[in-house]
Amino acid sequence: MKGTIIKGIGGFYYIKIDNSEEIIECKARGKFRHTELTPMIGDYVEISIDKNNKGAIEKIYERRSELFRPAVANVTQALVVFSFKNPDINIDLLNKFLLLCEYNNLKAIVCFNKMDLVNKEDYKDIISMIEQAGYDIIFLNAEKERNMDIIKKLIKDNVTVFCGPSGVGKSTMLNKIIGKETMITGNISEKLKRGKHTTRHSELIYVDEGLLVDTPGFSSLDINFMEKEDLLHCIPEFRDFIGECKFTGCLHHREPNCAVKKAVEEGHIHKNRYDFYIKTLEEFMNRRKKKW
């Protein structure tokens, strides 16, 4: 039988069988321990059931995409959820999430929640930066369901993951979409104005002819598994200019006659995005030096 992993808890995986409402609890075969392949939420798998009615994952089919921390496979799009206030926006963290989406070939849509707390005009430079990078933006108030109809339309025929830091309203958004309190939603700490890590586990849910993954809200994101060569291809607004640089393999850093740096000077690429790229590039280069 074949199906999709919709949940994983304590070494057990719950598989929704194709063309059926049946969900079967399985464990992964021991052979997976000897490989680098570990079952992930969203994996399309083949399973067997023994004479004792115990399920086992026999095969994991090739993944179309992978998202790490949290681990989710075969996602087609990411709703990158942030707020301008409560908690305050962290631009570097937003850029890291977008970077990870690009690395995994995920369509990223930026969702700003809690818009009732702010005046959008006060954040027009941030908004301009994101739009200039080519990302769609949706402005939300999930509690009052403002623009949640747009989110529901996006879900259809997609496998969608909610990404973003703790406390921005990812679980609230999911609750509104599916119409019940599926995940425990924590209150914001008054002292820190940051969310509690209250989402218990990752789970894939069938909603509106699509699949949703609700993921734990992390306040930091590690991208150290990437290399500087990966970084070059994960800033989409660079792509129109890369072939115009004087030097093949230009890192758009200290090289002369760099088309990307010229585009920044002329306002075609937002300076904050370029500064984030340089900061991240230098972190990668320093990490490589330490390895040697």
Swiss-Prot record:
Co-factor binding comment: Binds 1 zinc ion per subunit.
Please name the taxonomic classification of the source: Bacteria, Bacillati, Bacillota, Clostridia, Eubacteriales
- Which residues are listed for GTP binding in this entry? 113-116, 164-172
SUPFAM superfamilies the record matches:
Nucleic acid-binding proteins, P-loop containing nucleoside triphosphate hydrolases
Q: Which Pfam families match?
A: RsgA_GTPase, RsgA_N
Query: According to its UniProt entry, what is the function of this protein?
Result: One of several proteins that assist in the late maturation steps of the functional core of the 30S ribosomal subunit. Helps release RbfA from mature subunits. May play a role in the assembly of ribosomal proteins into the subunit. Circularly permuted GTPase that catalyzes slow GTP hydrolysis, GTPase activity is stimulated by the 30S ribosomal subunit.
Q: Which Gene3D superfamilies match?
A: Nucleic acid-binding proteins, P-loop containing nucleotide triphosphate hydrolases, Probable gtpase engc, domain 3
Enumerate the cofactors the protein uses.
Answer: Zn(2+)
Q: How does it assemble?
A: Monomer. Associates with 30S ribosomal subunit, binds 16S rRNA.
Per the UniProt entry, the Enzyme Commission number(s) are 3.6.1.-
Is Protein biosynthesis one of the keywords? no
The residues that hold Zn(2+) are 245, 250, 252, 258
- MF-aspect GO terms: GTP binding; GTPase activity; metal ion binding; rRNA binding
Q: Where is this protein found?
A: Cytoplasm
Q: What does UniProt give as GO cellular component? A: cytoplasm
Question: Locate the CP-type G domain: which residues?
Answer: 64-221
- What GO terms in the biological process aspect are recorded for it? ribosomal small subunit biogenesis
Q: What is this protein called?
A: Small ribosomal subunit biogenesis GTPase RsgA
Q: Which UniProt keywords apply?
A: Cytoplasm, GTP-binding, Hydrolase, Metal-binding, Nucleotide-binding, Ribosome biogenesis, RNA-binding, rRNA-binding, Zinc
**What is the main EC category here?**
hydrolase
Q: Which organism is it from?
A: Clostridium botulinum (strain Langeland / NCTC 10281 / Type F)
What protein family is recorded? Belongs to the TRAFAC class YlqF/YawG GTPase family. RsgA subfamily.
